[in-house]
Amino acid sequence: MAKAIVLLSALCILALANFAHCRPEVFDVEGKVYCDTCRVQFETKLSENLEGATVKLQCRNISTEAETFSVEGVTDKDGKYKLTVNGDHENDICEVTVVKSPREDCKESVSGYEKARIECSDNVGIHNAVRFANPLFFMKAESVQGCKEALDELGLFPLEF
């Protein structure tokens, strides 16, 4: 009888431990938005962080394409944003999109580069509640002075500046 009580107690404790380990699925998505001053579609030493840029995270069901989650945010003085995603979105495609630039001189977006895809599920092999999105950007209408030199330092040779 004593063995049965010990066994039952151990099972109850394990069940409670498993319950205590449960946590709501909440993810933080962090990223950055910058102004591409050289119009090369990647960051250079002349790129400028964009404070006040609006970004939107949107999750859509893979099969139906119905929106399952959406949240907007604004970048800080360093061009960084942090968005909170509630729930597991294993069956969704989640993307962060640049929505609006705070600067009139740097507001051009490039089709195909205005989004960063992220995984918002515990079931993808990532054991961290923070997800990092690729940097997003807006471009100036014209390249600024010094771009040729900045690209030369990187070993890149621009075709036209």
Swiss-Prot record:
This is Anther-specific protein LAT52. Keywords: Disulfide bond, Glycoprotein, Signal. Disulfide bonds join C35-C106, C38-C147, C59-C94. Residues 1-17 form the signal peptide. Belongs to the Ole e I family. Pfam families: Pollen_Ole_e_1. InterPro entries: Allergen_Ole_e_I_CS (IPR006040), Pollen_Ole_e1_allergen (IPR006041). GO terms for cellular component: extracellular space. It comes from Solanum lycopersicum (Tomato). Expressed in anthers and pollen. May play a role during germination or early tube growth.
